[in-house]
C-alpha cells in the first residue's frame, strides 16, 4: 500500500510499472507492424542486471499456464504502443510549432530524449524519483540523447517547480508538457496541484498532454469475475515471477477531477481522444470481451488560450 512520502527504485512499487512499460515498448519494437520503434527499451529492460520475467516476455520465451494471461499482455502491448505513438506525434507537432522546451513528468524509463528527432536547441527535462533517474542514466550512459537532456530528481509531491527552475527551465518560453501514466499514482489533491503548477509555469503557446481515464481503473466486478481475475494474476506471476498489484499503488479518489474538464476550465483549449478508438484507428482494436473488463484510457491534449 502507498504511504505519504514513499519512494522507490526501478524494481519496486511504482517504479516497477515503468519497467513493465519499457518491456511492452521493447516487445512492440520487435513486431513487423510496430507502431513505434524504441531500440532503447530493450537496453533498459536488460539493465536490471538479472534474467527477469520482463526480459523473457520481450524474448517471447514464456509458457503461459493460463492463455488469458498472455492475451492480456498482448493487449497491454497494443495499448502502450498506441499511447506512445500518440504522444510521440504530440511532441513532434509541438516541435514543428517552434516549441523548444519539453517537460516529461514522472518520466520513468521514457526514452524520447534519445529516440525522437528533436530540432536543434531543444531541451528535454525529465522529472522523477532520484533512483529511477540514476538507473536510466547508468543504463543509457553509452548513448547520446538527440536533445539536451536534463534530469530533475524530485518527487512530484514536493516542490518540483523550484527544482525544475534550478535545472534551467525558463517559464518565459513556451513548453510542451507530458503527464503519461502518472495521474492514478497521485492523490486527487496532488493532481490538482500538478495541473495548477503547470499553468503557472506555462508561457503563451505552451501545450500539455495527459493520459486520463474514463471511470475507475479498478472496475467493479462480480464475485466470479474477481476469482477469475485472481487466477489470471497468479498465472502471470507464475510465468514471469513479477507481481505488480496495481490496486495497491494507485489512488481511487472519488473526488478526482476529470483532467480534460479541469484543464478546459483553467485556460487550456482541450481535445480528447478515446484510447480504444485510437487503437482501432491504428489497427489494434480491442476485442469486445476484453473491452468489457478494462478501463478506457483518454488521450488528452491542450493548448494554452
UniProtKB/Swiss-Prot annotation:
Coiled-coil regions listed: none
Keyword S-adenosyl-L-methionine: yes
Molecular functions (GO terms): methyltransferase activity
Pfam families, per the entry: LCM
Chain residues that bind S-adenosyl-L-methionine: 128, 155-156
InterPro entries tied to this protein: Ppm1/Ppm2/Tcmp, SAM-dependent_MTases_sf, SAM_mthyl_Trfase_ML2640-like
Biological process annotations from GO: methylation
EC code(s) of this entry: 2.1.1.-
EC class: transferase
Keywords of the record: Methyltransferase, S-adenosyl-L-methionine, Transferase
UniProt entry tagged with the keyword Transferase: yes
Function: Exhibits S-adenosyl-L-methionine-dependent methyltransferase activity.
Family per similarity comment: Belongs to the UPF0677 family.
Protein known as: Putative S-adenosyl-L-methionine-dependent methyltransferase MAB_4607c
Amino acid at each position: 500500500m502507498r504511504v505519504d512520502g514513499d519512494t522507490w527504485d526501478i524494481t519496486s512499487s511504482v517504479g516497477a510499472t515503468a519497467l513493465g512499460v519499457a518491456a511492452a515498448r521493447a516487445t512492440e519494437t520487435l513486431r513487423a507492424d510496430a507502431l513505434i520503434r524504441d531500440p532503447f527499451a530493450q537496453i533498459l529492460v536488460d539493465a536490471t542486471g538479472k534474467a527477469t520475467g520482463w526480459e523473457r516476455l520481450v524474448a517471447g520465451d514464456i509458457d503461459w499456464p493460463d492463455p488469458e494471461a498472455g492475451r492480456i499482455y498482448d493487449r497491454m502491448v497494443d495499448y502502450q504502443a498506441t499511447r506512445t505513438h500518440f504522444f510521440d506525434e504530440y511532441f513532434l507537432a509541438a516541435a514543428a510549432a517552434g516549441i523548444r522546451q519539453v517537460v516529461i513528468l514522472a518520466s520513468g524509463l521514457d526514452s524520447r530524449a534519445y529516440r525522437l528527432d528533436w530540432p536543434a536547441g531543444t531541451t528535454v527535462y525529465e522529472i522523477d524519483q532520484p533512483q529511477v533517474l540514476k538507473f536510466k542514466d547508468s543504463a543509457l550512459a553509452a548513448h547520446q540523447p538527440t536533445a539536451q537532456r536534463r534530469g530533475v530528481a524530485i518527487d512530484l509531491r514536493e516542490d518540483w517547480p523550484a527544482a525544475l527552475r534550478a535545472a534551467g527551465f525558463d517559464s518565459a518560453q513556451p513548453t510542451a508538457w507530458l503527464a503519461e501514466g502518472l495521474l492514478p499514482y497521485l492523490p486527487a489533491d496532488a493532481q490538482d496541484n500538478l495541473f495548477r503548477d503547470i499553468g503557472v509555469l506555462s508561457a503563451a503557446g505552451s501545450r500539455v498532454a495527459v493520459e486520463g481515464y474514463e471511470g475507475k481503473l479498478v472496475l467493479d466486478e462480480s464475485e466470479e469475475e474477481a476469482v477469475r481475475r485472481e487466477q489470471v494474476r497468479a498465472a502471470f506471476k507464475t510465468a514471469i515471477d513479477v507481481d505488480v498489484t496495481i490496486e495497491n499503488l494507485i489512488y481511487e479518489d472519488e473526488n478526482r477531477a476529470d483532467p480534460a474538464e479541469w484543464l478546459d476550465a483553467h485556460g487550456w483549449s482541450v481535445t480528447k481522444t478515446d484510447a480504444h478508438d485510437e487503437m482501432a484507428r491504428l489497427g489494434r482494436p480491442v476485442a469486445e470481451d476484453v473491452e468489457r473488463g478494462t478501463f478506457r484510457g483518454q488521450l488528452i491534449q491542450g493548448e494554452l488560450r
